[in-house]
Amino acid sequence: RHSCVRLDRMISDLLMLIKAQEPVTASEANRCDLFSQVSGAVDDLAGAARDAGVQVRVGGKSPVMIHGEADQIRMAVRKMVENAIVYSHPGGAVGVSVALSPDGKNAVVRVIDHGEGVPKADLPRIFERFYRGSNQNERTADGIGLGLAIVKHAALAHHGDVTVWSAPGQGSTFTLSLPVGD
């Protein structure tokens, strides 16, 4: 049963990666509230957070309108939060925030954890397809290295960007920036 679930997840991640590589054209039909997508992604992971003993908090204001495929945005945020949960210590907390950039041109989602952090040697490759960092553990054993690649390609398809700051033992901050909708 575990193998079937893992295979299903791999196939799902591969399909998401393929879809995330298709450019998104801004239109009135694909305007969505980023805060709603972020809140939905966090709600989707409530059980996983509870099982890991990690508290996830969302902050920001609504609406923050962007042009984009709502499902792709939600999945990208979900992958960021899922990683933060998995790499956090039991009893830890993950902070998720939605805000506008200082110039007001971008919507910014930040996912902050105080977990293991990413080893410096892994940082240049962390968004590559199938790349798995050197800090794997029993909670990360089922991953195949597509989660952050999905985030990167979803960001690029939406004319945005994703960055990471991390220090071993201090945690990580992943920042997804997307152009705001007019």
Task: Please provide the spans of the model-predicted regions.
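A conserved beta-strand-to-alpha-helix junction within the catalytic ATP-binding
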Residues: E28-D43, L100
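Conserved micro-motifs of the catalytic ATP-binding
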Residues: E22-S27, M65-G68
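Short helix-loop "hinge" at the ATP-lid/N-box region of the Bergerat-fold HATPase_c
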Residues: A84-I85
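Short alpha-helical segment of the dimerization/phosphotransfer core of two-component systems
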Residues: H2-L7
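Short conserved segment of the HATPase_c
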Residues: V118-F130
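Conserved catalytic submotifs in the C-terminal HATPase_c
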Residues: E28-R31, R50, Q55-V64
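Conserved glycine-rich
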Residues: H159-G160
